[in-house]
């Protein structure tokens, strides 16, 4: 009997108040869903951007092909480091790159000077049959021991210019240095790198010859 009376006294919720509560719940759910969707989209775009940057960071960079030097019978006075972009690398701006060399006691840092390049003091190109170390190609002797020059070896699309020396697929250039003679005595271990703005550096590692022969002033070092 009491159970019947209890059930008879229960009434379903109805009226405008209930409708307002229901609509409010729907709106809250919609707002929450919108926030989740927007957050998901943002995170997806962020992940895609980060993935692309990481891929470029891993693939981009420079490789050292070989290193040639000129000696004066007692020291290496000029250095030419042949470089090219890594396979799959994005474009590399050499004006933002830094070259470092060290013999364990002295560390030198070289940068590219676009002002001197515009005046043809630190930029050149090897013509057919030309010499890399010829003063007509690039006046290396006038360069300071804190800057590097660029000699274009191969650049089909003309991307590596004096003011904007950009390397891309297929390009080969020589980074030339006017060295401090105290660094390059015989049997000296030289280490260093060519560090681009983004990506892996080109590694420099060689030991200077035990003796410098007068009959051959140009030597291959790496």
From Swiss-Prot:
- KW Lyase (keyword) present: no
Instruction: Give the keywords, sorted.
Output: Archaeal flagellum
Q: Which GO terms describe its molecular function?
A: structural molecule activity
Q: Which residues form the propeptide?
A: 1-12
Task: List the InterPro entries.
Answer: Flagellin/pilin_N_arc (IPR013373), Flagellin_arc (IPR002774)
Q: Which Pfam families match?
A: Arch_flagellin
Its localization reads: Archaeal flagellum
Which GO terms of the cellular component aspect does the record hold? archaeal-type flagellum
GO annotation, biological process: archaeal or bacterial-type flagellum-dependent cell motility
* Record-stated family: Belongs to the archaeal flagellin family.
Task: Output this protein's name.
Answer: Flagellin B2
**Source organism of the structure:** Methanococcus vannielii (strain ATCC 35089 / DSM 1224 / JCM 13029 / OCM 148 / SB)
| Gene for this chain | flaB2
């Amino acid at each position: 009997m009491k159970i019947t009376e209890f059930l008879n006294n229960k009434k379903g919720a109805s009226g405008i108040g209930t409708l307002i509560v229901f609509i409010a719940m729907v709106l809250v759910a919609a707002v929450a869903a919108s926030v989740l969707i927007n957050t998901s989209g943002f995170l997806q775009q962020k992940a895609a951007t980060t993935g692309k940057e990481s891929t470029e960071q891993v693939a981009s960079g420079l490789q050292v092909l070989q290193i040639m030097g000129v000696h004066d019978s007692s020291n290496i006075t000029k250095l030419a480091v042949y470089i090219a972009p890594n396979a799959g690398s994005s474009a590399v701006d050499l004006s933002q790159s830094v070259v470092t060399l060290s013999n364990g006691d002295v560390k030198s840092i070289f940068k590219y000077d676009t002002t001197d390049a515009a005046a043809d003091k630190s930029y050149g190109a090897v013509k057919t049959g030309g010499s890399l170390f010829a003063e007509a190609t690039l006046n290396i002797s006038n360069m300071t021991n804190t800057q590097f020059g660029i000699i274009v070896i191969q650049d089909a699309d003309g991307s590596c210019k004096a003011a904007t020396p950009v390397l891309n697929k297929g390009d080969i250039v020589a980074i030339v240095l006017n060295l401090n003679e105290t660094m390059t005595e015989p049997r000296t271990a030289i280490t260093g790198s060519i560090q681009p703005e983004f990506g892996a550096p080109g590694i420099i590692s060689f030991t200077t010859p035990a003796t410098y022969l007068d009959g051959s002033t140009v030597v291959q070092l790496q």
